[in-house]
A protein has these predicted regions:
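The feature captures the beta-strand-to-loop junction immediately N-terminal to the Walker
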Residues: 39-41
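Helix-to-loop junction immediately C-terminal to a conserved catalytic motif
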Residues: 54
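Conserved ABC transporter NBD signature motif
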Residues: 62-70, 79
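Conserved ABC ATPase "signature" region
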Residues: 103, 118-136
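Conserved ABC ATPase signature
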Residues: 140-144
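Catalytic Walker B motif of ABC-type/P-loop ATPase nucleotide-binding domains
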Residues: 165-169
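ABC ATPase nucleotide-binding domains
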Residues: 232-233, 238-266
Length: 266
């Protein structure tokens, strides 16, 4: 894949005039092959930041550049060629088949009511094969498990043919097996050169992916180039809870973060 960079330049956002900023003067960047995990408690602005990057929410200050294109002033169609969004999970009542829903991602680049071309349908089939959902191609999405629906949502985003994927709590409400499937897919995409930003409440998911980390405190984000640079004290300050880290000699790194019981927080 070619070179790629997202640059977030001193953005500030509040939900209304006179309201406190969710974040202020926030700057960071991600490049091809980066996975950035945004960690933090509920309500600290993780999902809000993704919404600002997608321009669903409009920042009051700053700029967001994707390969030199200012996303804030770009058209919806221009943004759809640069950045793709994977929601927490697609609706359980979606009647589209897996193949139809996955191929919908291609129409976001060309027009909401356009039909996918033969080439785009061939790419749909290739992406379903990569994600291991080919056998489900004729099945309605509403009949899928949560993990299967999440893979379909990732497939739809990949059909946009962008270099940047934003994933909001991609493993929320999934059992352990399906969490592993989704996390392995994220790692596979990162290795292929995609830039990925995902939100999570769970530090161990960043540990598994050995990703970059942004600790969201509410109003600010502390960035680390490696999850190994994040200290126990920093995690406890973010989650306001005493934690225990478990180290694995097999992989030579911390693999699990568990809260200590018997305390109501710091």
């Amino acid at each position: 894949m070619d070179s790629f960079e997202l640059v977030v330049d001193a953005i500030s956002f509040a939900y209304g005039k006179g309201q406190p900023n969710i974040f202020s003067e926030l700057s960071f960047s991600v490049k091809a092959g980066d996975a950035l995990a945004l960690l933090g408690r509920n309500g600290v602005g993780k999902s809000t930041l993704l919404s600002c990057l997608m321009c669903f929410n409009h920042v009051q200050k700053g700029h967001i550049y994707c390969n030199g294109v200012d996303l804030i002033s770009a058209s919806i169609k221009e943004r759809a060629k640069l950045i793709a969004f994977v929601p927490q999970i697609i609706g359980a009542d979606i009647a589209y088949t897996v193949r139809d829903y996955t191929s919908f991602g291609a129409t976001l680049r060309t027009g909401m009511f356009s039909s996918p071309s033969k080439e785009e349908l061939e790419k749909t089939d290739a992406i379903m094969e990569m994600l291991g959902i080919t056998a489900l191609r004729h099945k309605p999405c509403r009949d899928l498990s949560g993990g299967q629906r999440q893979l379909v949502a990732i497939g739809c985003a990949l059909l946009q043919d962008t270099r940047l994927l934003l994933m909001d709590e991609p493993t929320s409400a999934l059992d352990i097996r399906n969490q592993v499937i989704v996390l392995e897919t994220i790692e596979q995409l990162r290795a292929q050169g995609y830039a990925i930003i995902f939100t999570t409440h769970l530090p161990e998911q960043a540990l598994l992916l050995n990703s970059r980390v942004g600790l969201c405190r509410g109003g600010s984000i502390d960035f680390y180039d490696s999850v190994s640079d994040v200290t126990l004290e920093a995690l406890e300050a973010v989650y306001k809870t005493k934690l225990s880290l478990f180290y694995s000699d097999t992989v030579n790194r911390t693999v699990c973060v568990i809260p200590q019981l018997g305390q109501k927080g710091m």
